[in-house]
Amino acid sequence: MPIIHLFAPSVNFTICAVRAMMVTVMKMTDKKIKLIALDLDDTTLRSDASLAPETAQTIANAVKSGTQVVIASGRAFKSLPQSVLQIDGIRYAICSNGACIEDMHSRTRLLSFTLRPQVVERLLETFSGERFEAFVDGQPYCDGEYYREPLRFGCSPAYIDYVKTTRIPVDDMPGFMRRHIAELDSVDIMCGTLEHRAELWEKTKRLSDVYVTSSSPRLIEISAAEAGKGAALQRLAQILNIPPQHIAAFGNGDNDADMLAFAGLGIAVKNASKRCLAAADYICPTNDEHGVAITIEKLLTSN
């Protein structure tokens, strides 16, 4: 299927203006969309990590229409934004890059894949001296220095408050990871610079039985081999008995590419990574241009 671009050239516009300016009015799919999977950061959320009121309302409208809306994030469960969680009717959350699926109604985990202890030991040996984040039972813990000075490790200024309000700092992360060696949903390695990231990425080839991805130039994210948003979405779709052709997925990062490839309709925001764009069927306006809201409205109209 050719990639269709669904964005207007101007970045200063309202949703109504975008509707008038959109060059593509074709029906996006001939299949009824029953499930919409949403990546959050830099996709559904704006670049300042906030949720636009227009986007929140459109998601709520989708839920009210009977469409299953699923969060699909690299974030740990306990760091998901309240602005999204408070939208009534969202039940399932794929978290930690697909390492777990949370049922927020029953407050249980449907599925969970933790890193194997021998993998964690190999990881600590391979990346000795690096700064880590570790997710345990949905709670993110991070290196104490990173918590105190996130900018020094490449954190965006817009995400400083996110780090401070969601992470629990630990000064001895390797020791912490060993104490919780059988409980780790996933581990992030702080890169700081693109050059250092390239060096660390090369080292990941020494690991086996892992899923390695990245949602940000400052992070390398490592989970169990069974993880991945695409694999998790496939498992959830099987539980809900929804075929891929009735699924739409939105994303922006490398860690979203497999999810977009699995969905019958893979949609990348215009600001997405090259790998994510390549996996998409459609490209919509950026996260700061209400791309998710605009496209969901089109999907609801098509439905």
What kind of feature is each model-predicted range?
Residues 66-70, 89-91, 186, 245-246, ...:
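Short active-site oxyanion
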Residues 34-47:
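Asp-based phosphoryl-transfer active-site loop
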Residues 130-131, 135-250, 254:
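Conserved acidic, metal-coordinating active-site core of Asp-based
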Residues 1, 21-22, 26:
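Methionine residue identity
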Residues 29-35, 51-52, 220-303:
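Mg2+-dependent phosphoryl-transfer enzymes with acidic/Ser/Thr/Gly-rich catalytic loops
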Residues 4, 11-13:
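Short terminal hydrophobic/aromatic SLiMs and anchors at protein ends
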Residues 50-155:
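Active-site phosphate-binding/coordination module
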